[in-house]
Amino acid sequence: MSQLTIALTKGRILLETLPLLEAAGIAPLEDISKSRKLTFETTSPDVRLLILRGSDVPTYVEFGAADVGVSGKDTILEHGSTGFYEPLDLRIAKCRLMTAGIAGETLKPGRIRVATKYTNLAKQYYAEQGRQVDLIKLYGAMELAPILSLADEIVDIVDTGNTLKANGLEARDHIADISSRLIVNKASMKMKHQQIEALIDAISSAVNERAAA
């Protein structure tokens, strides 16, 4: 049987993905959280795990360095590729992609500045709104941008909204609902169809059982 490579990313998505993989008979032989390794053998001899930066997972899957990956819908949309299949919503790491700004302030007319790490999604969203924007690419501490007048709005992931409130900001417009998805390389789906279909079925069952619990 061919080896199957699954790309994951550390953090919340990994913590919520591992139980789904375990339900499919796949568990790392080492504690990922205590290791600096980037590849891990598993209890299934024909499956190995890769630990990547979240934004890199779609790229590894698209170009076949990984057969399967788990990625947030925000990352998939920002990546913008049609180079892989997206057969399953894992219904984990749920949140929303939203605009946000200073609480109580009205957005000024005309051209605005928007800070975000999702520049492609933001460009598309504001174009659909008929709004001209200058985009500022940031990688973290997004809430500081409106506070320090670097930007009029931000586009970011919102979970509870508590971080926004703690920094005097408010969520504004909803852009997309986000959750983690299983993605599959197109060539791998053809070459390793039986293995991948079995994996999808097993994980899908685990997702449904979790939802019913």
From Swiss-Prot:
GO terms for molecular function: ATP binding; ATP phosphoribosyltransferase activity. It catalyses: 1-(5-phospho-beta-D-ribosyl)-ATP + diphosphate = 5-phospho-alpha-D-ribose 1-diphosphate + ATP. Keywords: Amino-acid biosynthesis, ATP-binding, Cytoplasm, Glycosyltransferase, Histidine biosynthesis, Nucleotide-binding, Transferase. Its main location: cytoplasm. GO terms for cellular component: cytoplasm. It is found in: Cytoplasm. Its EC number is 2.4.2.17. Pathway: Amino-acid biosynthesis; L-histidine biosynthesis; L-histidine from 5-phospho-alpha-D-ribose 1-diphosphate: step 1/9. GO terms for biological process: L-histidine biosynthetic process. It comes from the Bacteria. It holds the Pfam family HisG. InterPro entries: ATP_PRibTrfase_cat (IPR013820), ATP_PRibTrfase_HisG (IPR001348), ATP_PRibTrfase_HisG_short (IPR024893). Catalyzes the condensation of ATP and 5-phosphoribose 1-diphosphate to form N'-(5'-phosphoribosyl)-ATP (PR-ATP). Has a crucial role in the pathway because the rate of histidine biosynthesis seems to be controlled primarily by regulation of HisG enzymatic activity. Heteromultimer composed of HisG and HisZ subunits. Lacks the C-terminal regulatory region which is replaced by HisZ. Belongs to the ATP phosphoribosyltransferase family. Short subfamily. This is ATP phosphoribosyltransferase. It comes from Saccharophagus degradans (strain 2-40 / ATCC 43961 / DSM 17024).
